[in-house]
Amino acid sequence: LVHTKHAERFNRLLGEAGASNLRLIQVSELDPAIMLQLSQRLDRGEWLAIAGDRVPLHGGRNVRVDFLGHPAAFPQGPWLLAGLLKCPVNLLLCLKQQGRYQVILEPFADAVQWKRNDRQQMIAQWTARYAERLGQYCLQAPQQWFNFYPFWKTDDDLDP
C-alpha cells in the first residue's frame, strides 16, 4: 500500500522490470472490495506491506506518539488494517552494516485487536510500540533512516 497518486505508473514499471507479482495499491483506493481482496490474499499466504512511518503529506489519520524523545505523527492505517484484517504484523528493515546489507524481518504482533470502545486507544498503543522499536533501530544506524520531508514539523510550525 502506498501514499502516492502514481501507484498505477509504479505498477506498470514494476511489471516492465519483471516484478509482475507485486501490486502497489494507493491507500485512497481502499474500499470494501479491495479489503476483501486483501483478506483473500493474506489467506493464501501473500503479504501486505505498508510503511509504518510515513504519513500522507496532506491530511489523513495519524497518531502523535513519542519518537526519539519528541512527539511525532505516525499513520493509523497499518494498525487499523491489521486489526480489520486480523493478520499478524512483522517489521521489515534493511540496515547496511560493515559494507553489507542486512534485511531484518522481525515478528512484531500476532494480532492487533480492540473492542469497539477502545479502538483509538489500542491503535495509539500499537503505534507507540512501533515508534519505540523503530527508534531503537534508528539509534543503532542513525544515518540510515531516510525521510524526505520535515518529519517532526507540526501545524504549529506553520504559524508566523
Residue ranges of model-derived segments:
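Non-catalytic C-terminal accessory region of glycerolipid acyltransferases
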Residues: 16, 20, 32-160
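Membrane-interfacial amphipathic helices and adjacent loop/beta segments
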Residues: 1-30
